[in-house]
């Protein structure tokens, strides 16, 4: 996707994947700065380290404590989080973004922190469910401190019998369920999340899984319903990163075609929304 975009604007396609152990990351970041890299993307579990290691962080990165993008220039290493742009694009493109909604958020990792930042600006209430409740509570506490936040935040646990009535109510009232965990495995499909009160969900609730691929989404197995995957989010967070690196308008259709080909699906199945690019991480001509 990124190489196709670089080629489309006349630059050499040199976007490469690097697989690293956690212990190798500090040396790699120093090398990237010294060897003239223009930018980097980070996936789990390196998003927190990307925030901590950068010389300059955007406000969104400071709020969430995670970054998925670095821009490297004469200004030094700058950290951004374009996941928020991607999420907003995905929810808007599918007509799922509406003020005053109640949301169930699965997971409390790096992706969930950016998702929470967006949800806090328009949702009425957000229930965060995670196997480590302390991580879920940290997300809630961070969002409640933000001036843009208008949501009520809640953490409930299936393991606590006293939480079950509140869980049932939250699921029954949820307009959206967003799975940020990013794991499509058989073990997860039969794990503790399978015992959540999925039958209580309203039939009108929209379901989103930030992961993508050919394996079934756990959400679809738990609910027996259709689930939107994260391809649209991936496209738009990638386009925002592209513009940060190049200071050029991202060739969104080229990127979509390349992504669709990689995923083996029609390009039309991945909606495009140019207005989402730079919505939260503003830059260049979009300021």
Regions found by a protein language model. Name each.
Residues 121-125, 225-226:
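Conserved S-adenosyl-L-methionine
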Residues 252-287:
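A short, charged, Gly/Pro-tolerant segment at domain boundaries
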Residues 123-149:
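NAD(P)-binding Rossmann-fold cofactor-contacting core
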Residues 79-81, 91, 95-120, 129-135:
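Glycine-rich adenosine-cofactor-binding loop
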Residues 132, 157-192:
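Rossmann-like NAD(P)-binding element
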Residues 1-96, 214, 222:
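Phosphate/diphosphate ligand-binding glycine-rich loop within oxidoreductases
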Residues 72, 185-188, 192-258:
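Rossmann-fold NAD(P)-binding glycine/threonine-rich loop
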